[in-house]
Design a protein with these regions (language model features):
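Non-catalytic alpha-helical scaffolds and adjoining flexible linkers that form interface surfaces
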Residues: 1-247
Length: 247
């Protein structure tokens, strides 16, 4: 067996047998990996604090032929404040579900890990609305996965000057000369186009540095929701709960 140290975040944890847990780690070095934490449910286990969802830090694990086993954890951020905020916690669970959906073992998932970490921090800072954080996260996650919408020019002809509308099914902006067969198009405020362009093109570190007006936020919500419906083939349980508690 090979002992390695990885940096990452616990996406989920589930009991295995009487005393163990199986956790899913999103790591900088190995992508998304399943890790067994043996004896972690015994009273006084030194690993108990390192296997809770949201826990971020360094994990020392053994790499076996078919599985990983956790040996120790040094947690730098538990995001403990989220546990006292029901709505904030479910935003976090939803973000982790999306990360789990997209990420794979042995892939370079550094950008997704960074996005997840910065998004949880943004929820805690409360500088911008959670509704906006959600749409930024969703759209950027899709972009990191290689399915970014075209928002700088027409998806058909490439023109970047003419007015146009956003079509989720077409994959982005369609100009007025090419929109004859667009049936799901939305005409957007100029500020909404600028917001989409900023999210698509900016680094993760600069994502949560702005806010928008309510009309722009509503358009952004509609656009991202439609885009997710087309490109994400999964129903997220945490999102269903989040939307139910917001009603």
């Amino acid at each position: 067996m090979n002992q390695i140290t990885v940096m990452g975040m616990v996406l989920s944890a589930m009991p295995i047998g009487e005393y163990d847990k199986r956790i899913v780690l999103l790591t900088r070095e190995r992508g998304k990996i399943p890790v067994f934490a043996k004896g972690v449910r015994r009273p006084g286990s030194a690993l108990s604090g390192g296997v809770m969802p949201f826990s971020f830090g360094e994990f020392t694990i053994y790499e076996g032929r078919t599985s990983y086993t956790m040996m120790s954890a040094s947690i730098s951020n538990y995001f403990a404040e989220l546990r006292g905020d029901v709505e904030g916690a479910y935003y976090g669970f939803y973000f982790m579900e999306i990360a789990d959906y997209y990420c794979r073992e042995a892939n370079d998932e550094r950008e997704m890990l960074k996005l997840l970490y910065q998004s949880l921090r943004a929820i805690l800072k409360e500088r911008i609305p959670n509704r906006l954080i959600r749409r930024i996260y969703e759209l950027k996650a899709v972009c990191i996965n290689g399915e970014a919408p075209q928002v700088f020019g027409c998806v058909v002809c490439g023109d970047s000057v003419r007015d146009g509308q956003f079509s989720a099914k077409k994959g982005g902006k369609v100009c007025v000369e090419c929109d004859m067969d667009v049936f799901d198009g939305m005409r957007l405020e100029v500020s909404t186009w600028h917001t989409l362009q900023y999210i698509v093109s900016s680094s993760v570190e600069k994502l949560y540095t702005f806010t928008v007006s309510e009309p722009v936020l509503k358009e952004l919500e509609q656009i991202v929701e439609r885009y997710m419906d087309v490109y994400v083939e999964k129903q997220f349980k945490s999102l269903e709960i989040l939307e139910s508690i917001q009603q």
